[in-house]
């Protein structure tokens, strides 16, 4: 078993760190709001550090799940950042969804300290984190990935190296583009279904086993029909991710017309006060548009 630090105890990070304890690892945690770290340690039995650097000191693996590019830079760099405390040969695993640009920046900064860096964004949402069945897409040197993979298996059902540094983040963009399209299509289908006076649950029971079936249909149709949007990844975070997708697509010269449109639909949801609603709330926008 390994000596591990986990940085960032939000709705994803807290259960992920808990699975590390269950797997038998010794875990030290750090969180910007210290009370969250103390509450986590009381529940799981780990220890709390005052800074990211202190949490990372002498650990074989340092894992992070924070908010965005700036948060990752802050948690890694500076005298209180994780890199300052990490020993040579240690591995930093970043589960945050950030730009490939900042990932490569952190990869280079880690290398200067003879620390390995793995970009490892996750898919599966809060439920996947709580149940330990996340999908984890990784960009890293082969050796760093092989060392970190058993640690990530504590909370990941599918853990795959996609390529070198930045490849994991780029794969996550593919994931988010696909999910955005699926959710808009499902929202339109269910809104149409209800407007036509059909029993939405009965319709889904028939079609979910066919070509239209998806994880989103299986797991979100009922809450979407009921107008309950507190069951997953928040719209605010999806807009952050889609912003990364669109910026990267521009750099690549790739057109993402549907993604750009759905991003604006999510902006409409934010304007409705739904920034913290889950991403299936696109259907609520359609309902309000239909109502005039």
Region locations from a protein language model:
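NAD(P)+-binding Rossmann beta1-loop-alpha1 motif at the extreme N-terminus of oxidoreductases
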Residues: 1-64, 90, 95-96
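Helical "substrate-binding/catalytic lid" subdomain
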Residues: 147, 167-290
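Hydrophobic residues within alpha-helices
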Residues: 16-17, 106, 192
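Rossmann-fold dinucleotide-binding core
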Residues: 66, 98-176
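Rossmann-fold NAD(P) dinucleotide-binding segment
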Residues: 52-115
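Hydrophobic beta-strand scaffold residues
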Residues: 27, 48, 116-118, 159, ...
């Amino acid at each position: 078993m390994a000596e591990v630090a986990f940085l960032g105890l939000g709705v994803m990070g807290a259960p992920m760190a808990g699975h590390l304890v269950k797997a038998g690892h010794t875990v030290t945690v750090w969180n910007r709001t210290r009370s969250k770290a103390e509450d986590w340690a009381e529940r799981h039995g780990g220890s709390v550090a005052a800074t990211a650097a202190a949490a990372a000191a002498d650990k074989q693996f340092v894992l992070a799940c924070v908010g965005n590019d700036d948060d990752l830079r802050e948690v890694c760099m500076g005298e209180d950042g994780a890199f300052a405390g990490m020993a040579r040969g240690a591995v930093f695993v970043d589960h945050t969804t950030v730009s490939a640009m900042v990932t490569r920046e952190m990869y280079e900064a880690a290398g200067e300290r003879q620390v390995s860096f793995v970009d490892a964004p996750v898919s599966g949402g809060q439920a996947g984190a709580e149940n330990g069945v996340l999908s984890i897409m990784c960009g890293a040197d082969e050796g760093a990935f092989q060392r970190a993979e058993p640690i990530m298996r504590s909370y990941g059902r599918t853990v795959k190296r996609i390529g070198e540094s930045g490849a994991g983040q780029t794969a996550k963009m593919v994931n988010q583009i696909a999910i955005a399209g699926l959710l808009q299509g499902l929202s339109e289908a269910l809104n149409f279904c209800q407007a036509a006076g059909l029993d939405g649950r009965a319709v889904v029971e028939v079609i979910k086993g066919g070509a239209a079936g998806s994880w989103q249909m299986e797991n979100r149709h009922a809450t979407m029909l009921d107008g309950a949007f507190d069951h997953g990844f928040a719209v605010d975070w999806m807009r952050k991710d889609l912003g990364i997708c669109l910026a990267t697509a521009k750099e690549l010269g790739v057109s993402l017309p549907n993604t750009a449109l759905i991003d604006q639909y999510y902006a409409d949801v934010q304007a409705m006060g739904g920034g913290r609603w889950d991403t299936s709330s696109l259907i609520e926008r359609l309902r309000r548009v239909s109502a005039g």
